[in-house]
Amino acid sequence: MSEKKDILERLSSLLIERKNYTEDNSYTNQLYSAGNAKILKKIEEEASELIEAGSEERVIKKEIVHEAADLWFHTMVLLAFNEINPLEILN
């Protein structure tokens, strides 16, 4: 579990860095600039895409993994935007 916590901590740190480095024109910074509502909208979109991928008559594991990763990423962006450490969820 420690290795997984390390990955969460590293990703969280990177997302916070991006938030604080406003000159970066990355996708992540574009989300931060657009604000909380835009980030929530992306989470809604990604959740819908994950549900759709999992609901297909012929479920394709690769698509579910891809959509789940997108949902996790945008959720991590929301946490960083609101200064919430993901380890709070694990506790």
Language model regions located:
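Flexible "arm" and connector segments at domain edges
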Residues: 1-68, 72-91
